[in-house]
């Protein structure tokens, strides 16, 4: 396995202007192989990538990189006015080549093109074709082809895969990918997995995609200000951590047992000393000994008792410190255990109707769990938005299949209940100025604050977190607050609709989402490309949405 360090971190610290310090004194290295970078949301993984990429400057410490870096941020779809060429990172060179072709022979343009840039436009189009992305786009003359398409016209998955294709095209020495599988459908994920599988330089990938993390040479975990690197896949790392944690829990049990023993010995010592003191006072009262002897014995006893008290206290203090040290080595294994309100969804209760362009209807009834799958760009999110945003529900009303404003015929959906909880891909509906408690109270205004705090604690939102402004939360924390608000709504949602819920969630948060959903007793409809997640939530059906708007039930 490659062992040459491509990135070296030395006592790296970074603080934001408000004083928050996500990276504090981190040292370590990434080798020339493929490294999966994991860690809880909010531990600073994205910040660390930006520091390595040179997008941020360390507050103290240093980052040393061998060769060039290429950085793919987590959010690549925000600049909707950018072009595909911008997303690929080739716009400047292509513009220079086009200007020269139009008769502009300024020397600086030739410097931009260099020796290898003359055919970059053709190579970029070929790379997109090889990645099977934007296959339906025109790739004709310069200025009107696929490279000039606006990012705003791409689906989220198309934008991500285009950016990943740019990483391959540019071929930097060190590639840094931040959650690259977000919004990718199954085929696009396979393409990304192939990129990782065949990468020849140093590659550091932040991801919660377990399948991708099984392709790496090393796993690095950023946790509580330290970077732990393990020479193996994430699955192997999990097994190693499990062994280490069992040993740590055993050490903690031993330390706690020692502390209990030292406490007992201290108490017994105090009792013996107290008995001796009582006996001494009795002897003095009985004038059993002459006063000089009594004073000598009292002084000797006080010295001995002080020494014994000190020794017992020191032994207990050492045992208590050992417990604290052993406790720090044991990870919190927080699990969501909640008793959610009953949404009252009997088996025959109709919740929604979906209709494909072929005229087939699918009725969601009772506590069903349905996955809506399909390639990027077919309209899964649009269908969910119609489902939760359609007009007043009725028992026999179904949205009509027809052409949208863009002339594309799509499937339709209609909710048959007012009690729908919806978590979109982008959690834009959260009030950033509100506290977590106030945000959750919006959906449950009649629940007393004290009871709501208790419920939040069951969702692992505890203590000071409840009073934090929403704007200070990480992506995973924002999602957990949004999920908590939906699941604790009063009255409870009868149908829960989730659009790519595992995007931006770390592996532990995904586990907690699965746990929370296991307590939900209503109907569930979820769009996700995360096959591992879908396999864990007890699906009762899967519907595939095709490019023509047809809905097909997938055999399970």
Regions found by a protein language model. Give the residues of each.
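Coupling and communication elements adjacent to P-loop NTPase active sites across diverse families
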Residues: 1-13, 93-160, 240-357
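Conserved beta-strand
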Residues: 9-12, 19-33, 61, 353-371
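ABC ATPase nucleotide-binding domain signature region
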Residues: 31-35, 46-110, 367-450, 529-532, ...
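Conserved switch/coupling elements of ABC/ABC-like ATPase nucleotide-binding domains
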Residues: 63, 211, 224-239, 532, ...
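ABC-family P-loop ATPase nucleotide-binding domains
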Residues: 78-153, 424-494, 500
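GG-anchored amphipathic helix commonly corresponding to the ABC/SMC/Rad50 NBD signature/C-loop
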Residues: 156-176, 388-389, 477-497
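Hydrophobic anchor residue at the start of the ABC signature
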Residues: 164, 192, 483, 502, ...
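Catalytic Walker B motif of ABC-type/P-loop ATPase nucleotide-binding domains
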Residues: 175-179, 184, 495-500, 505-506
